[in-house]
From Swiss-Prot:
PANTHER family: CYTOCHROME C OXIDASE SUBUNIT 1. It comes from Salmo salar. GO terms for cellular component: mitochondrial inner membrane; respiratory chain complex IV. It is a multi-pass membrane protein. This is Cytochrome c oxidase subunit 1. It catalyses: 4 Fe(II)-[cytochrome c] + O2 + 8 H(+)(in) = 4 Fe(III)-[cytochrome c] + 2 H2O + 4 H(+)(out). Its EC number is 7.1.1.9. Fe(II)-heme a binds at residues 61, 378. PROSITE patterns: COX1 (PS50855), COX1_CUB (PS00077). Gene3D superfamilies: Cytochrome c oxidase-like, subunit I domain (1.20.210.10). Component of the cytochrome c oxidase, the last enzyme in the mitochondrial electron transport chain which drives oxidative phosphorylation. The respiratory chain contains 3 multisubunit complexes succinate dehydrogenase (complex II, CII), ubiquinol-cytochrome c oxidoreductase (cytochrome b-c1 complex, complex III, CIII) and cytochrome c oxidase (complex IV, CIV), that cooperate to transfer electrons derived from NADH and succinate to molecular oxygen, creating an electrochemical gradient over the inner membrane that drives transmembrane transport and the ATP synthase.
Length: 516
């Protein structure tokens, strides 16, 4: 197995594996950072030192989890592995560009880590707002390195998005219409369009910040006629679609898992699911200012962003109830991926409800920058995106490797993780309602109890992460090979066996279209 196989690979399966391994490694880095945060907050008083180092850790935690864990695993890992198999394509449309998309990520990660190692680090929060991110409050190279890191990650994602859009539109067998493709393919298509439209705006914003810092421009400096609010608009025009980019592939994976373990041949309301994802993608672009309710917008502007944000709950509700309808009347197979999917549906819905609370501009004025917001987005990320990733991983692991995971241990792992994340993030709702602000390393004694409980929860999650590594080791050590696969119309990716050959669909698949 020459090293060139991995460095120069143009094979979608190899590149998908690289993404999965990279994402798992980054996930462990991000978990370590989050444990530092929870250790600092486990009791009043200082542990790490000042708030600069604390905020550097918070900022790095966010960037690592978003750009180097969730996106590489969901889009790069599962997207690369599954989409060519699901649509019957021999590979991605641009296999060498696919390789470059991956190899831009390790240098990007390196730059992010370097930003923590020089000067005082980038303690700006992942939003990198000026004037805090300007060259007075953050002198030195830290923020500049962070900006370059984001540039590389952004280029990687844009190239990947172009690749997925081209592949999905161009590389299906002619007989298959777009409306016969699996929901995961649709999810990644919508995600790729969102990436393609939002990332250039982020690039513009952070490039202007870079020139403000180094070339004496004043895009975000009132002294020269600029406005820091402009940066917020540019950032959140990317930042809000970004959170849908993080969850949409998860929606696709959950649809597959729920349909498969319900014994159904298709998810309930396939077209409704497709339209819902497209509606979420569209609406995701016109609600960005709900992150900025505290900057002093007109009341009519606030009214618009409040109502537009609430409208997103409708297509989301369509998806949640369609998953429940898919489960209804099925012969349920109670295997671990379904447990993750059920956990996803329940906890994502809880996170969505707190999102509806925060959509109210008047309430958000009070709750903005408190732990209520932290609890909200960790419910949809730490229990939405991550649960979808875990469910998809235990579901498709036999496809990727040809080996099966130990079903009892994966169920125990699910139980530990479920307890851990809920114990970590549920109390944060109470902290937020009691007014505890985000991004501070210390707090008044009144907040001690819930913070201590939250930190204990984070340690339980750590146990789950370590157990997951053990489960992985056990599967590769025991080498239980997959005996047989139930083929239905919805799991075509398993057609070639486990694992599939290195090259699949080398000649176009024969597709028989049913006369309906």
């Amino acid at each position: 197995m020459a090293i060139t196989r991995w460095f120069f690979s143009t094979n979608h399966k190899d590149i998908g594996t690289l993404y999965l391994v990279f994402g798992a490694w980054a996930g462990m880095v991000g978990t370590a950072l989050s444990l530092l945060i929870r250790a600092e907050l486990s009791q009043p008083g200082a542990l790490l030192g000042d708030d600069q180092i604390y905020n550097v850790i918070v900022t790095a935690h966010a960037f690592v989890m978003i750009f180097f864990m969730v996106m590489p695993i969901m889009i790069g890992g599962f997207g690369n592995w599954l989409i060519p198999l699901m649509i019957g394509a021999p590979d991605m449309a641009f296999p060498r560009m696919n390789n470059m998309s991956f190899w831009l990520l390790p240098p990007s990660f390196l730059l992010l880590l370097a930003s923590s190692g020089v000067e005082a680090g980038a303690g700006t929060g992942w939003t990198v707002y000026p004037p805090l991110a300007g060259n007075l409050a953050h002198a030195g190279a830290s923020v500049d390195l962070t900006i370059f890191s984001l540039h590389l990650a952004g280029i990687s994602s844009i190239l990947g998005a172009i690749n997925f859009i081209t592949t999905i539109i161009n590389m299906k067998p002619p007989a298959i219409s777009q409306y016969q493709t699996p929901l995961f393919v649709w999810a990644v298509l919508v995600t790729a369009v969102l990436l393609l439209l939002s990332l250039p705006v982020l690039a513009a914003g952070i490039t202007m910040l870079l020139t403000d810092r180094n070339l004496n421009t004043t895009f975000f400096d009132p002294a020269g006629g600029g406005d820091p609010i402009l940066y917020q608009h540019l950032f959140w025009f990317f930042g809000h679609p970004e959170v849908y980019i993080l969850i949409l592939p998860g929606f696709g994976m959950i649809s597959h898992i729920v349909a498969y373990y319900s014994g159904k041949k298709e998810p309930f309301g396939y077209m409704g699911m497709v339209w819902a994802m497209m509606a979420i993608g569209l609406l995701g672009f016109i609600v960005w200012a709900h992150h900025m309710f505290t900057v002093g917008m007109d009341v009519d502007t606030r009214a618009y962003f409040t109502s537009a944000t609430m409208i997103i709950a409708i297509p989301t509700g369509v998806k949640v109830f369609s998953w429940l309808a898919t489960l209804h009347g099925g012969s349920i197979k109670w295997e671990t991926p379904l447990l993750w999917a059920l956990g996803f549906i329940f906890l994502f819905t809880v996170g969505g409800l707190t999102g509806i609370v925060l959509a109210n501009s008047s309430l958000d004025i009070v709750l903005h920058d408190t732990y209520y917001v932290v609890a909200h987005f960790h419910y949809v990320l730490s229990m939405g995106a991550v649960f979808a990733i875990m469910g998809a991983f235990v579901h498709w692991f036999p496809l990727f490797t040809g080996y099966t995971l130990h079903s009892t241990w994966t169920k125990i792992h699910f139980g530990i993780m479920f307890i851990g994340v809920n114990l970590t993030f549920f109390p944060q709702h109470f902290l937020g309602l009691a007014g505890m602000p985000r991004r501070y390393s210390d707090y008044p004694d009144a907040y001690t109890l819930w913070n201590t409980i939250s930190s204990i929860g984070s340690l339980i999650s750590l146990v789950a992460v370590i157990m997951f590594l053990f489960i992985l080791w056990e599967a590769f050590a025991a080498k239980r090979e997959v005996a047989s696969i139930e083929m239905t119309s919805t799991n075509v990716e398993w057609l070639h066996g486990c694992p599939p050959p290195y090259h699949t669909f080398e000649e176009p698949a024969f597709v028989q279209v049913q006369a309906s």
